[in-house]
């Protein structure tokens, strides 16, 4: 009986470890690790989702107290005494996220509001999307991996490159360390693009979606070349529903 019980405990521990590894989602790097590995001649732009919000999805919707604490913790992870630049959408919760990350970094809150962070970047025709019932996580994730839905959505690769070109135009006014806060639709699509579709955000298949404070690190060398790493500010880059 004792032997059977020990075997059962071992199986349970293995199963738990596997579940945690699956939930953490191989492919999302801890934001602190990515930050610590930056070379002195590299710049970084963290494009991430806002912190945990309440049930108000409107522009006036705010972070929960937990969401504020999450953002401050992420700021502490990427704190180095160097002033960062912040940009957010016109939604209050993205500004709050930037502000609390700045608190965690002990930064002055230098920030701008950017329209390209509002979350609709990849949606070509919102009327079509709504008429066809595509305004949901299932459709967005399937489109990002498999394409199609051309009447409502742009081409993922082409539209992502357009966004990155737009980012380049802002770089002269930015810092070496930069934090951009957007929304789940925008960040999910960019994470799928930046990882060459390697991150597991197949919501229409397995109910996995981008977590709060997860996204993409855009690392820029002295010659302007870009490379990408998907990052997580919390324990996981994925929300499993």
Each model region followed by its residue ranges:
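Sec-dependent N-terminal signal peptides
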Residues: 4-13
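Flexible, surface-exposed loop/gating regions in the mature catalytic domains
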Residues: 55, 82-85, 99, 109, ...
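Active-site-adjacent alpha-helix immediately C-terminal to a catalytic or transition-state-stabilizing loop
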Residues: 161-225
């Amino acid at each position: 009986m004792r032997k059977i019980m020990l075997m059962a405990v071992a199986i349970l521990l293995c199963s738990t470890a596997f579940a945690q590894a699956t939930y953490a989602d191989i492919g999302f790097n801890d934001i602190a690790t990515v930050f610590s590995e930056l070379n002195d001649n590299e710049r970084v732009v963290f494009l991430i989702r806002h912190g945990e919000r309440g049930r108000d999805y409107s522009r006036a919707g705010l972070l929960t107290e937990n969401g504020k604490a999450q953002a401050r913790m992420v700021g502490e992870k990427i704190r180095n005494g160097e002033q960062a630049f912040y940009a957010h959408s016109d939604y209050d919760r993205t500004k709050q996220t930037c502000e609390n990350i700045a608190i965690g970094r002990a930064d002055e809150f230098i920030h701008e509001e950017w329209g390209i962070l509002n979350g609709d970047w990849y949606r070509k025709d919102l009327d079509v999307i709504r008429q066809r019932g595509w305004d949901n996580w299932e459709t967005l994730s399937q489109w990002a991996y498999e394409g199609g839905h051309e009447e409502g959505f742009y081409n993922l690769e082409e539209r992502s490159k357009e966004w990155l070109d737009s980012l380049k135009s802002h770089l002269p006014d930015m810092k070496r360390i930069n934090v951009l806060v957007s929304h789940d639709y925008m960040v999910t699509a960019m994470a799928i693009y930046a990882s060459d579709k390697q991150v597991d955000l197949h919501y229409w298949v397995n109910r996995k979606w981008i977590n709060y404070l997860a996204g993409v690190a855009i690392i820029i060398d002295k010659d302007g070349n870009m490379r990408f790493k998907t990052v997580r500010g919390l324990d996981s880059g994925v929300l499993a529903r």
